[in-house]
Amino acid sequence: MADVEMMEYVDDVYEMDCPKFVDFSVPQVVDDNADEWFNFDHENGVPLTFDDKAVSPTAKETPTSPLPQDPQESHSVIGHSETDTTLQESSAPEIATSEKQKYASPSDDVSSAESETCEMSTDSMQDKPAVPESAVRNVTDDEATVQESSDAEETQTLPSSCVDSSTAEMSTDSLEDKPQKPQMQESPKPRKRYGNLVTSFARRDEDTTTASSDHSEPEQKKPRSRQRSVEVVSRPTRKSPRLHSRRSAEPTRLKRPSITSQAVKRRSANSALGHPRSRVLSTDQPISKRRKIGSEITPAGRPDAKKSCPKLKAKINLTMPTTPTLLKRNLAKPNTQLKTTEQMELDRIAQFQHKLAAIRKKSALSYKAVKESVPVAPVHAAVQPTRPEEFKFETDARLKSHTMETRKDTKNKDFVGNLRKYVPSPSKPQGITKPRPFNFSDNRKRTHEESFSGEKKGYEFKATALAVSQFHTKTPDRFRSKPLSEQNKGPEPAHDRPKKAKLTQPMTPALESRNRHRPVTAISQAQREEQELADMKNYKFKARPVDPRVMSNIAVGVKTVHHKEPTKPIGFDLEIEKRLLERETNKVQTEERYEFRARPLPAKILAGPVGIAEAKAAAVTIPKSPAFALKERVKVYKEKEREKEKDSEHDNSHIIKARPILHAGVPFMPNIQHKRTEPEPFSFDEKIQESKARKEAKIQETLREEERARQFRAQPLPDLTWCSGVPDKKVKPPTQMAPFSVAEKGAKQAEEWSKKMEEEIRDCKRMANAFKAKPANILYEEPFVPEKSTKPMTDISNFSLNTERRAEDRKGYEQAKYERQLAQDTAQAQREAEKEEELRQQISKQRADSIHKAKPVRHYKAVEVLPSTKPLTQPKTPKFSDRTRRSSHTS
């Protein structure tokens, strides 16, 4: 059970099953009630309490017997039973010991035990009665003998600290003269702390009862919380079924009240009465030695010691140990009730049920996750595994006495058994078998989804130009390095696995159609039929007058169709054809050898220069001084002005001459040609007569052909003279055997190949060096004149846009919606106003009703006391009889 409960404490970080304890390294809050933490078993969730009221009747009547001489008998008398030993081990850690002895080292234990015999100050013993010497001297000789005889055994088991810390014990008889202490009813009632590990309960009860019977001096001290009995306390029952192996090594403490002056006086008085001090069991000792220590304690509750009980003085001053504030603990409350075994079993069963429910919930979640997860395809290596082959040595064949193969060498294979044997292919990866429907015929046409099945799921459309540019610029993904986490991945799970069908959650769509009320423009079938029927009834046929031109001239309204001339094919004059023809001519003709032939020299060259014009004599240059200076140019200008003035002085009359009119050219005169349509007489009679004649001729020709087709004409018999017999069989001549020479043929082919290559090289050079200009045919062709468009002008007519119609409809809809919303708001406001008015009236009515109105004093009719009509009671003397009483007494 303990192991099961320990599983609840799992560390989420390190995933370790370990119990959780309080970290005492952290400074704790100083509190007098801090000891209550140790009164609760935090690992099991059960409080720790001890039943001190249980008393063993046998221990009460068992006196202290003298020690026999036999050491074996001494063990039987002194030692406890096996049950008592277990009691001592289990109760030892639960009974409080000195706070100093628990947390001190062994050397500290010795010093603390020796310091207990030191003298106490006189102030601490003022209110305590003197301890009688008889209480100390009444230690029997038998007890001293028992202590001396068990010296050897205890020395081996107890450490030095335990031996030194043991003090003198007192018997039950020596505590008879202890003064009785009056009990005061105070609240709260703190519990007294005792130091002995095993027999402190019994000794404490004996001391209190003996002291209360002899002494009657009143003291102002706090009474004990419970009435102690003289009997030996039985084994305390623990509420928790937890094992006590770990707790037996570290003794816990009982509840200890705060240290006050009264508590110090009571503790010093109890220590003076001879209460034994506690022995600290070292946690380093094994369990076997601890059990041995517990077994060596006497039934009366005294530990065996080598030294006899020392004589105590009248005033024993002890050094009181002080508990650190960190270690102040509170015990379980005295009113804590213990659970029975049945209740503990029921709690344990409930815990198991909770754990089972949690495990079932986890398993259900795990099963659900496994069920919904994608199946993992097995990973198969692309490379086949290495197949080991046996070594075959040539020397193995030499060991055989014969070379023939025996039946043992060959394995007998069952042919029939191997027919249906399945041999898996290791090269192909084995996946999950997917059932597919069987079809006798299948459509080869791929769908749009199947065409992109090879692409990834996130396929997006790309333009061809973008795809081509990315193909030339970007590096494909297959050439990019991948991380190790992606390289070591197995095959991806199948994406085409059908998903698990789930229930469709119906949801009401939030449609806005209920708020829209568009006019219905479409008419129904019945309305359409009624409309057509009405149109048919209203329709009246009215013939239009015939155009007289139709009756007079047949060709009216018929357009003359001008037949186009048939296309005349013109051959293409391609340059490549010319080149091919020239190439063929060059191949046939042999190259002419160029020979230099000198032409006769003309006689004019010898007579003189030919083609050179005569040299003209250049004129002599006339030197002129350049007019560099501006002054000279100004002088020349002034001289010219003076000459003009002189000339004007000579002319007495001033003559004004008009400037000539510039020649503006030939004036533009538009040449407008006025064409007039001159009506000419015309008639269609000739054309009609010609068409009738052609029609009659065609009809006669058709009749003649039909008559000719109806006439019977017999076909002549075939001429069978040329095919009178069986044709002769053509006999092919037999193949004539002729020798062949591979060497000559190969040499001839090589020679032809070399010639062919030389010709091709020569042609390439000639074609590369030759320049051929294309003929300038464009010089002799007519210039390009664009034709005028025959399309009619665009007819711009009125049109109605659908957006305008929809805008008008939308405007009407918005107006209707606004009016409807306005009506709703008005109605809502009216309802709210009515509601407010009703509420106001109700409040006013309640206020009016709540006003107290005193009721008027009612005046009733006065009560008339009428005399009674019954007669008065007439008193009569009763008739007493003694007969009944006499008969009852006699019987």
UniProtKB/Swiss-Prot annotation:
Detectable in immature oocytes. It comes from the Eukaryota. It is found in: Nucleus; Cytoplasm, Cytoskeleton, Spindle. The keyword Thylakoid does not apply. Residues 236-246 have a biased composition (Basic residues). Residues 42-310, 418-454, 472-518, 723-746, 789-891 are annotated as: Disordered. The keyword DNA repair does not apply. Residues 108-124, 155-173, 791-802 have a biased composition (Polar residues). Disulfide bonds: none annotated. GO terms for biological process: regulation of mitotic spindle organization. Residues 42-54, 442-454, 803-822, 831-852 have a biased composition (Basic and acidic residues). Spindle assembly factor. Required for normal assembly of mitotic spindles. This is Targeting protein for Xklp2 homolog. It comes from Patiria pectinifera (Starfish). The lineage of its organism: Eukaryota, Metazoa, Echinodermata, Eleutherozoa, Asterozoa. The gene is TPX2.
